[in-house]
């Protein structure tokens, strides 16, 4: 228990060290996720990002990512549920890993394309089903294209195959989303996860897919704050009839 608390505490302490904002037209690096959906974004070589998601049921998930080479990044993550609140903390079974490779940069006509693997899901972890409330992307391919329209407007698409399959749903999955800048420091993000891999067998979804919306604000000198609304279509079979509210925090800073 003490080791797990120390591991998570390292992420929190590191937050005061890292810097570089990501919302609005003045953003200095690429978004790697909209809310839960991977994009084709990748960490710049020599930069490191520390992020934290705070979700219902006392869930806290922290991640650190590093741009190792041009077009290659690596990250680790960890968290649990009931971290905020009282009672016993339910730690995730294993840390998550995140690897990305940029296979094609964006051009005037073509989107950027990134291949990757991410084993980190979000929300509570269900040991009997060996899955997270929000399944991890697993293996994924993501494409992203930017347009100039009253600032910047970005569109994103993704195909993924998760390794969380004990619930009986082993399908490939698709998702798409957008990011729209509002001035120099604010962005609005949205995504739709078809959840083809979360609607049959013992899956937690009802077949509506997951519609999520959020906002990102570059507070200054690297600090990015975000607000997320998840499951606006009321797709989950449990605790339904309302969207989940969450907070997102991220810092980026050159480290080598």
Regions found by a protein language model. Give the residues of each.
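A contiguous pocket-lining binding segment that forms or flanks enzyme active sites
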Residues: 173-178
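Sec-dependent N-terminal signal peptides
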Residues: 6-10
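Positively charged n-region of N-terminal signal peptides that target proteins for export
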Residues: 1-4
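N-terminal signal peptide c-region/cleavage motif recognized by signal peptidases
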Residues: 14-19
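Transmembrane beta-barrel domains of Gram-negative outer membranes and organellar outer membranes
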Residues: 20-155, 159-164, 179-256
